[in-house]
Regions:
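Short loop/turn motifs that connect adjacent beta-strands in outer-membrane beta-barrel proteins
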Residues: 6-9, 55-57, 99-101, 151, ...
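Gram-negative outer-membrane beta-barrel transporters
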Residues: 20-21, 108, 130-221
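C-terminal beta-barrel architecture of Gram-negative outer-membrane proteins
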Residues: 70, 186-246, 261-262, 266-271
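Signature of Gram-negative outer-membrane beta-barrel scaffolds
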Residues: 1-55, 76
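Membrane-embedded beta-barrel scaffold of Gram-negative outer-membrane proteins
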Residues: 53, 59-63, 83-169
């Protein structure tokens, strides 16, 4: 890894990584099925970038990274996976002033053999992933930290993205179909957050934390049966700190009230398909199914931390 000042205002960096990974596994998984893996990978992951100081407190940057990642044990248990490969291009702008900190980041990610969630789960409840050929993620991320005055702090953020399989095939009713571009599973196109903090003293602070997650699919075939609806949830967080005596340096009391408006939503679930070959002899019918994990309504956590 190296960083170098190239000329006035310009700084470059380069980061070279060489990874070697070996998998050797032999045994049994669910039931009498045998499980054997003997794979070795060598990955070269280079990264380089350029930063330009536009003005005091403002920087523009561009970077490129090539990343390669091996499958994990669960991937091997559920198939014959290949390592995924990524070319990542990013362009961004940072602002850092006493009243405003902001960052804009635009990314373009080209994947080959990306290991994506299928929506299905295995016999022990672990999510199943599979390689999907070519896929792409493009997006923009905006983050702000604004000091409104000496007591109020505002921290909004938003991420807009397009997350797609580029040439997805699916076997429906016994016939292999090219679905073309489909949405990647568990990849909402819109995610936003907001925090408004009130800090009247160094001892006490209270904040309202909000999060919005847009509609997403739990599978890769754009089936409405696999939809996770958009949701908006708000939490309240408070912290009070004091120093009682020389024996206890600090006592910190915290309160986190989750989902203060008691929103009814599901943030996760699973989706599966199977071929029905027995209901109608000589006919194959693809059946879709889904399950959801409802989230708790209003709930709270409180705690006390002592520092001696």
């Amino acid at each position: 890894k190296a960083t170098q000042t190239l000329s006035e205002g310009f700084t470059g960096f380069i980061d070279l990584q060489l990874r070697s990974i070996g998998y050797q596994v032999s045994g049994q998984i669910v039931g009498p099925a045998s499980f054997s893996v003997d794979d070795n990978f060598v990955f070269f992951n280079p990264k380089a970038g350029l930063t330009y100081e536009v003005a005091s407190g403002q920087k523009l940057y561009f970077s490129y990274a090539k990343a390669q990642r091996e499958p994990n044990r669960t991937d091997y248990e559920n198939g014959n996976p290949k390592p995924e490969k990524l070319d990542d291009f990013e362009l961004g702008w940072r602002i850092n002033t006493p009243k405003l900190q902001a960052q804009t980041n635009v990314y373009w990610m080209e994947y080959k053999d990306q290991l994506v969630l299928t929506g299905a789960i295995d016999a022990v409840g672990s999510p199943i992933r599979q390689n999907v050929g070519k896929s792409r993620r493009i997006g923009i991320e905006l983050e702000f930290k604004i000091n409104l005055n000496s007591n109020w702090l505002w921290q909004p953020n938003i991420a807009l993205s397009s997350n797609q399989n580029l040439d997805f095939y699916f076997k429906r009713d016994g016939v292999l179909e090219n679905l073309g571009k489909t949405q990647l599973a568990y990849s909402p196109n819109l995610v936003g957050g907001n925090a408004i903090m009130y800090v009247p003293s160094t001892r006490f602070q209270i904040g309202l934390l909000s999060k919005y997650v847009g509609k997403q699919y739990m599978g890769n075939i754009d089936s409405e049966n696999s939809t996770l609806s958009a949701y908006f949830v708000n939490d309240l967080n408070a912290v009070y700190t004091w120093q009682p005596n020389k024996w206890i340096q600090e006592i910190k009391w915290s309160l986190l009230m989750n989902n203060i408006f008691n929103a009814q939503y599901e943030s996760n679930g699973y989706f599966y398909t199977f071929d029905d070959t027995w209901s109608a002899p000589g006919q194959v019918t693809t059946v879709e199914g889904a399950g959801y994990f409802p989230q708790a309504g209003i709930n709270l956590l409180t705690g006390v931390m002592l520092r001696f």
